[in-house]
From Swiss-Prot:
This is Cytidine deaminase. The lineage of its organism: Bacteria, Pseudomonadati, Pseudomonadota, Gammaproteobacteria, Enterobacterales. One of its GO terms (biological process) is cytidine deamination. Residues 48-168, 186-294 form the CMP/dCMP-type deaminase domain. CDD domains: cytidine_deaminase. This enzyme scavenges exogenous and endogenous cytidine and 2'-deoxycytidine for UMP synthesis. It holds the Pfam family dCMP_cyt_deam_2.
Amino acid sequence: MHSRFQAALTTLAADLQAAIAPMLADPHFPALLEADQVATLQQATGLDEDALAFALLPLAAACARADLSHFNVGAIARGVSGRWYFGGNMEFLGATMQQTVHAEQSAISHAWLRGETSLRAITVNYTPCGHCRQFMNELNSGLALRIHLPGREAHALEHYLPDAFGPKDLEIKTLLMDAQDHGFPVSGDALTQAAIQAANRCHAPYSHSPSGVALELKDGTIFSGSYAENAAFNPTLPPLQGALNLLSLNGYDYPAIQRAILAEKADAALIQWDATVATLKALGCQNIERVLLG
């Protein structure tokens, strides 16, 4: 079991502890629960889905990397597939606050990059900030997404984001988590291919500046992240953050990164290169390459 879960596990009810401990045994537990694992936990505890998600929030919050604020926020995104995806806020010392990943973004990006096609609900241990409410409005589940907060009645996103501005106002039809393929030829070694594939499935309807990042770890594991734009621009999630989020959720630390590749267009309206390099160097990675999409 990864050390980050040890203290959080002791806060759970005894029956839930006993049921989930075997699932957490792998130090690289992927911070997600398959539908059958959710059913197993429900059977062991007698909890319905909503109550179980609340009970598991301490484990999601344990995934946070709040190196600046030391304020851990946890989120659990529930996919239409039945899978549950953990998320936690991420802050990067030596970078800028603009590189921060919020817990809701973490859980949603986690689900998206794992192939989930839509979300039913998200459970969070603190009220979503305006940034996250706007980020969620980019999803194909839209304002119908159910938000679950401790001690409050569940509401759809539209309750928390009235008179919302979103993709429809800009006549965007393809939404975040919809299937997308930008069709760039995939070639090169495994890491280069992963970066191009990540760019191919990114969501960039506003700038038309597709990009993807792939990170290779010392043990050969590869994590990739896709760019996720937002109608309000600022809540956009860069591709590096998507990859770093997966890396962290899977129990790895930044020093494990031995090589990184960014895939983007040379003539794109928005360029990720400088911000990607600056953040990776702040995390100790010096071997950074760029492949141009053709």
